[in-house]
Regions:
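Short, well-ordered amphipathic alpha-helices
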Residues: 198-203, 264-274
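Well-ordered, non-membrane alpha-helical segments in soluble/globular domains
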Residues: 110-116, 263-270
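Acidic-basic catalytic patches of nuclease active cores, encompassing PD-(D/E)XK
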Residues: 94-220
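Conserved catalytic cores of phosphodiester-cleaving nucleases, focusing on short active-site segments
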Residues: 198, 247-251
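Alpha-helix termini
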Residues: 126-128, 206-208, 234-239, 270-280
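Active-site beta-strand-loop-beta-strand hairpin of nuclease catalytic cores
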Residues: 202-224, 230-247
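C-terminal tail/extension regions appended to the core domain(s) of diverse proteins
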Residues: 1-109, 113-140, 258, 275-344
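Active-site-adjacent loop/helix micro-motif of nuclease/hydrolase catalytic cores
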Residues: 208-212, 254-266, 296-299
Length: 344
């Protein structure tokens, strides 16, 4: 299915024909819940977010090589996908109505997925350059100080909701973390390693088998590509030490005032456990938002890292970089440009 449908209604690729066939096959992007409506809710239709992406982005990954216009904003891709979805509803259901609330329920996840896919493809370009010395992208620009070094390949990994970061640790590192956990539990305390939305990792050398998947870009955001993106972290479990963690990214379209401190807490915990308990280098923590309106994100995210204050010397921010992630290409380029700065 195309990102934008043929405007000729008689064409075989016109939306009425495509959406009707999709719905008839049981692969539609909407679920009619009017019959089995949840008590106390007025929801009539629910969006199947995987199918929305599978339909709208079955030919390219936004902001990367293969995208007909990689300069577009995240918002433009999502707006077109939702327009396709609304039209599909009008084609397939009488009395169709889709509330903005239903769109909002999937919007953040789709935004995060698009960013993760763009970063994945940027990392694949980087890894090819590390191995061959050839820059094979026309969308991304090679960081001028990047030195092709096969041992400096990276994996930029989308973590699953509720995933356990400690599962990525090898046996020795997990034992160190477990000893730390047990010591706290003996005093009735805990400090769990949080799971960010996206992790940037140095691929171990020699490369474990599960990392081979990060050498190739995703061609699109079909269901198959989404599954790769969502499940890749499970294939690299039990492989990492603290030194392999480069950066973490919290991805949100926006953040409410009552959620401001969640990222700050996650950043401090990650930096303490990875830097002190597991004796890795200083991990960097990024917050990527589409808008900072509605809360004092800029002011609050100037907070110093508690770890750097306790260590003395020059303090650092808990959240190293607050970035307005408006376009997938620019967002991925920013991360690419930072990769040469990691000493190890």
């Amino acid at each position: 299915m195309p990102f934008q449908f043929n405007s000729d209604p008689a064409h075989s690729d016109a939306q009425p024909a495509v959406c009707a066939a999709c719905h008839a096959s049981g692969r539609g992007c909407l679920v009619d819940v009017r019959v089995n409506r949840v008590k106390g809710r007025d929801t009539q239709f629910q969006i199947v977010q995987q199918r929305v992406m599978d339909c709208a982005l079955d030919g390219f990954v936004p902001g990367t090589d293969g995208d007909p216009d990689p300069s577009r904003a995240f918002l433009e891709y999502r707006a077109q996908a939702y327009a396709n979805t609304r039209m599909a509803g009008s084609i397939n259901f009488s009395g169709f109505s889709l509330s903005q609330q239903q769109v909002a329920k999937v919007d953040g996840d789709i935004y995060e997925l698009m960013e993760a896919a763009a970063l994945w493809n940027a990392a694949a370009v980087w890894n090819n350059f590390m191995d061959t010395g050839n820059w094979n992208s026309t969308v991304f620009t090679r960081p001028p100080v990047a030195v092709p070094t096969p041992t400096r390949k990276v994996a930029i990994v989308k973590m699953s909701r509720g995933g356990d970061t400690t599962k990525l640790l090898n046996d020795a590192a997990r034992a160190e973390y477990r000893a730390f956990e047990v010591a706290l539990q003996s005093g009735g305390m805990e400090l769990r390693l949080s799971t960010p939305d996206i992790l940037g990792l140095r691929i171990p050398n020699p490369m474990p088998p599960g990392f081979g998947i990060f050498m190739n870009p995703l061609p699109d955001l079909t269901n198959a590509s989404q599954a790769i993106l969502e499940q890749a972290w499970t294939g690299i479990q039990s492989t990492l030490e603290g030194r392999h963690f480069l950066f973490a990214i919290a991805v949100k379209t926006s953040t409410r005032s009552d959620r401001l401190y969640q990222a700050l807490f996650e950043a401090n915990v990650l930096k303490y456990i990875l830097g002190y308990v597991l004796r890795g280098p200083a991990i960097k923590f990024h917050a990527h938002l589409e808008t900072t309106k509605g809360s004092d994100v800029v002011g609050r995210y100037k907070a110093a890292s508690m770890i750097s204050l306790l260590a003395g010397g020059t303090p650092n921010k808990a959240i190293d970089d607050l970035y307005l992630a408006l376009r997938p290409r620019d967002t991925a380029q920013k991360i690419l440009d930072s990769l040469p700065s990691y000493p190890l």
